[in-house]
C-alpha cells in the first residue's frame, strides 16, 4: 500500500495529516516548528521528542511505546538497543562531521550526532566554542584543523565522491559516511552497531 506523502520536516502539509485522522503524531523538537505542533494538537494527540544524547534516545523508545499503548514493546526495544550499544567507548580518533556545504556546517557538541560519535569512541573535532548546534566553519578554522578526518554525511546534504577533492585540498581527510547511522535514533539504532564499530576502527587505523 502506498504511504501518503505529507511533506518534509520543515514544510509539512497539515491538511493532509488531518485527512489521515491519525491517533498520534510524533514530532521532533529539533525538526518541527512549534506552530506545526500546535496545529496538529488541534485535531490529534502529539508526542514531541527532544533527543540530544544516547540516554535520551533510549528514553524516547519507551515514550513512543507508551504513547502507542505498546509499553512492553517499547521496553523491549530499549533493552535490545541498550544491550547492542553497550557502554561508551574510550575516545581515540577525532573527526569533524559535515552536514552541509556552502556554507560548510558541522555537527556541534549539543547534538545527537555528537553523542553517537562519542559513544563509539570518535571525538568531535568541531571547536567547542563554535556558536550554535550546527556551526559554520570558516576557512581560517579549517586551516587550524589540517590533517583532521572530516566525515561527509549522505544527508541532509548529499555529499558524494565529487566533494572529497575540495576537502583534501584544504588539508583535511575526507570520508563519505552513512548519515542515517549517525543521526537516526529509534529502532534504526539496532541496525547501525556494526557500521559504527567499523567506522571507529577505520578512523583509529589512519596514520597519524
Task: Locate predicted features.
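N-terminal ligand-binding lobe of clamshell/alpha-beta domains
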Residues: 1-208
Amino acid at each position: 500500500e502506498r504511504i501518503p506523502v505529507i511533506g518534509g520536516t520543515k514544510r509539512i502539509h497539515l491538511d493532509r495529516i488531518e485527512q489521515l485522522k491519525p491517533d498520534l503524531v510524533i514530532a521532533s523538537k529539533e525538526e518541527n516548528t512549534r506552530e506545526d505542533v500546535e496545529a496538529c494538537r488541534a485535531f490529534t494527540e502529539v508526542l514531541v521528542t527532544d533527543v540530544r544524547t544516547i540516554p535520551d534516545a533510549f528514553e524516547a523508545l519507551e515514550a513512543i511505546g507508551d504513547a502507542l499503548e505498546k509499553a512492553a514493546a517499547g521496553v523491549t526495544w530499549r533493552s535490545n538497543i541498550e544491550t547492542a550499544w553497550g557502554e561508551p567507548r574510550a575516545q581515540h580518533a577525532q573527526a569533524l562531521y559535515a552536514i552541509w556545504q556552502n556554507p560548510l556546517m558541522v555537527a556541534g557538541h549539543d547534538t545527537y550526532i555528537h553523542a553517537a560519535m562519542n559513544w563509539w569512541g570518535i571525538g568531535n573535532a568541531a571547536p567547542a566554542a563554535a556558536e550554535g548546534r550546527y556551526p559554520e566553519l570558516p576557512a581560517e578554522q579549517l586551516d587550524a584543523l589540517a590533517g583532521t578526518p572530516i566525515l561527509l554525511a549522505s544527508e541532509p546534504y548529499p555529499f558524494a565522491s565529487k566533494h572529497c577533492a575540495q576537502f583534501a585540498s584544504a588539508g583535511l581527510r575526507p570520508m563519505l559516511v552513512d548519515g542515517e547511522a549517525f543521526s537516526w535514533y529509534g529502532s534504526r539504532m539496532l541496525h547501525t552497531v556494526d557500521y559504527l564499530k567499523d567506522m571507529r576502527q577505520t578512523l583509529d587505523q589512519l596514520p597519524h
